[in-house]
């Protein structure tokens, strides 16, 4: 089994495997190009994002600056918005559903390092996937976390445990505050009138 395959399976792997640095530098060059573009060049910025990300649906937009380790491990549905200064450490897979709104300074960290110093000093790490459902608006997410659909994550929250569908969650660590109810939906309808 190759080190890249171990990485994709969430197994301890050697981060110095051949090709990894080249993949990282290719992505960082694209991020640099994106970050230097005029903010008004929306079409050009979207084109660079589509070069970076493995798969993305319609209507992807990111504000500057972004940092993405590899890009080929990130997939998103339609209507992805990434606000300023977001970080995606993606040796593991990051998947976003449709209608995902990422607040400023959010981080998605699939890399996880061993507690044991001997292993860590050998440049070994794990990569655990992050999965985000549809209709989600939130802050930072830790490795191995799944966030359900129709979720609101409060500002400044650090998500270290899975969050189910149809809830408001917040805090550090992030926890479910309450379900999203029919009253919330009715309030939304009233605002639209």
Predicted regions and their residues:
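Terminal amphipathic alpha-helical/low-complexity segments used for targeting or macromolecular assembly
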Residues: 1-59, 174-193
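Flexible, glycine/small-residue-enriched loop-and-beta-strand segment within the central core
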Residues: 66-76, 81-146, 172-173, 177-190
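Short-chain dehydrogenase/reductase
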Residues: 152, 168-170
């Amino acid at each position: 089994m190759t080190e890249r395959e171990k990485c994709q399976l969430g197994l301890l792997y050697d981060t110095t495997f051949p090709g990894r640095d080249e993949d990282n530098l290719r992505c960082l060059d694209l991020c640099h190009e994106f970050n230097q573009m005029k903010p008004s060049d929306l079409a050009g910025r979207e084109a660079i994002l589509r070069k970076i990300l493995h798969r993305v649906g319609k209507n992807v937009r990111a504000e500057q600056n972004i940092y993405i380790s590899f890009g080929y491990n990130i997939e998103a549905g339609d209507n992805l918005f990434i606000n300023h200064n977001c970080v995606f450490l993606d040796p593991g897979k990051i998947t976003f559903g449709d209608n995902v709104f990422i607040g400023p300074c959010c981080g998605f960290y699939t890399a996880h390092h061993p507690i044991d110093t001997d292993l860590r000093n050998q440049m070994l790490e794990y990569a655990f996937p992050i999965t985000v459902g549809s209709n989600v608006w939130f802050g930072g997410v830790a490795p191995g976390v799944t966030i359900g659909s129709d979720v609101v994550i409060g500002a400044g929250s650090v998500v270290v445990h899975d969050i189910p569908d149809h809830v408001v969650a917040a805090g550090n660590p992030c926890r479910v505050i309450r379900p999203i109810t029919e009253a919330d939906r009715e309030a939304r309808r009233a605002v639209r009138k």
